């Protein structure tokens, strides 16, 4: 069965549901890795720091986080090469467990379905809860690679539902000159 639209899960309208020791059958996170680029480098080694900031309070499913991570990282690899000198980090982890009350459709569904009786729902995935103004991704790079980083983030925020801002947090004076 395919995923439901992000609009079903993007609003934070329920209390946090994260106690994994009480919950069975949680599917694994689709996020493959959280640190990309040059692992050994220290963020202080780079002159420029650029972040992708969410403009509203939202939940982002783990599939969307992975899709945006992949898109941004592939763009950086294409622009800078396999041994490109940058460091990228995904700052959010999908802790929130998402449930769905499955509904039967089609002929005879009224005899099979229970409607809203015992409607707690089955676990279908996880999501990250993100508040307004929090950073989802950060890239540390050199000034000549800043345009590639901005383009990577532009591609990344097309894969997630909330409006986002790309902010140069360090080294902005190097990009203007």
UniProtKB/Swiss-Prot annotation:
<dbReference type="GO" id="GO:1990904">
    <property type="term" value="C:ribonucleoprotein complex"/>
</dbReference>
<dbReference type="InterPro" id="IPR022981">
    <property type="entry name" value="Ribosomal_uL16_arc"/>
</dbReference>
<dbReference type="Pfam" id="PF00252">
    <property type="entry name" value="Ribosomal_L16"/>
</dbReference>
<keyword id="KW-0687">Ribonucleoprotein</keyword>
<comment type="similarity">
    <text>Belongs to the universal ribosomal protein uL16 family.</text>
</comment>
<dbReference type="InterPro" id="IPR018255">
    <property type="entry name" value="Ribosomal_uL16_CS_euk_arc"/>
</dbReference>
<dbReference type="GO" id="GO:0005840">
    <property type="term" value="C:ribosome"/>
</dbReference>
<dbReference type="InterPro" id="IPR001197">
    <property type="entry name" value="Ribosomal_uL16_euk_arch"/>
</dbReference>
<keyword id="KW-0689">Ribosomal protein</keyword>
<dbReference type="GO" id="GO:0003735">
    <property type="term" value="F:structural constituent of ribosome"/>
</dbReference>
<dbReference type="InterPro" id="IPR036920">
    <property type="entry name" value="Ribosomal_uL16_sf"/>
</dbReference>
<protein>
    <recommendedName>
        <fullName>Large ribosomal subunit protein uL16</fullName>
    </recommendedName>
</protein>
<dbReference type="InterPro" id="IPR047873">
    <property type="entry name" value="Ribosomal_uL16"/>
</dbReference>
<dbReference type="GO" id="GO:0006412">
    <property type="term" value="P:translation"/>
</dbReference>
């Amino acid at each position: 069965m395919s995923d439901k639209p992000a609009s079903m899960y993007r609003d934070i309208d329920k209390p946090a549901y994260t106690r994994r020791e009480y919950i069975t059958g949680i599917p694994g996170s689709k996020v493959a890795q959280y640190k990309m680029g040059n692992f050994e480098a220290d963020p202080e080694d780079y002159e420029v720091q650029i972040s992708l900031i969410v403009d509203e309070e939202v939940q982002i499913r783990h599939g969307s986080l992975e899709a945006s991570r992949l898109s941004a990282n592939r763009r950086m690899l294409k622009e800078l090469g396999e041994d490109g000198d940058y460091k990228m980090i995904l700052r959010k982890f999908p802790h929130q467990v998402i449930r769905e009350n499955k509904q039967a459709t089609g002929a005879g569904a009224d005899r099979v379905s229970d409607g809203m009786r015992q409607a707690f729902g089955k676990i279908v995935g996880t999501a990250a809860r993100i508040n307004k103004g929090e950073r989802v991704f950060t890239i540390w790079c050199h000034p000549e690679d800043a345009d590639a980083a901005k383009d990577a983030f532009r591609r990344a925020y097309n894969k997630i539902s909330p409006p986002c801002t790309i902010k140069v947090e360090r080294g902005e004076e190097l990009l203007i000159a």
